[in-house]
Amino acid sequence: MEGPFISVEKKGAQDERNIITCNEEVCRRFLDASKGLVKYVGIAPERNEDAVSFIRAMKDKVNISLAHTNAGYDKAMEAFQAGANHAVHLYNAMPAFTHRAPGVVGAVCDSEHVDVELICDGVHIHPSMVRATFKMMGADRMILISDSMRATGMPDGQYTLGGLDVNAVSYTHL
């Protein structure tokens, strides 16, 4: 699940009305309702004063992912050291990876237990960055995803995504 404990600033196509802070009871209800189908829960640790406690409480019940987050390097490292073990669609819906502010990407590089997703559609991430990420992380940590939506392969036009209206133009709907 990419959320609902994510950042409003990095929400992407997520419906802002459904974004909430980390809540163990809500998370347990999701897990119980899914009868074991939910394997990952995405959080933005910077939105939650006590994200570390949430991660420690939930990490043995579900994989904790950093997703749709505006976390800097230190906050991401704190989450990974507490037990988060996954990063959702690396480079997308998170701060840029730079030499002075490595952000989530830098924290992932420094946390060998963390697996990463990459959207490999040739649009979300340049092919050179895909190759560089394989070199940085190693193939064993990589999960390649499409992140496609209902409009994939369809002509430009109006579509819906999670109940939201989307105007899909050109490559934006891959």
Task: Please give the residue ranges for each predicted region.
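Conserved small/polar residues in nucleotide/adenosyl-binding loops
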Residues: T172-H173
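Active-site core of metal-dependent hydrolases
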Residues: E25, D32-D156
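Divalent-metal coordination cores built from histidine and acidic residues
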Residues: E2-L37
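Anionic-ligand binding region
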Residues: G153, L164-V166
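Active-site donor-binding loop signature of nucleotide-sugar glycosyltransferases
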Residues: G3, H89, A168
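Short, surface-exposed, charged loop/turn segments at secondary-structure junctions
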Residues: Q158-G163
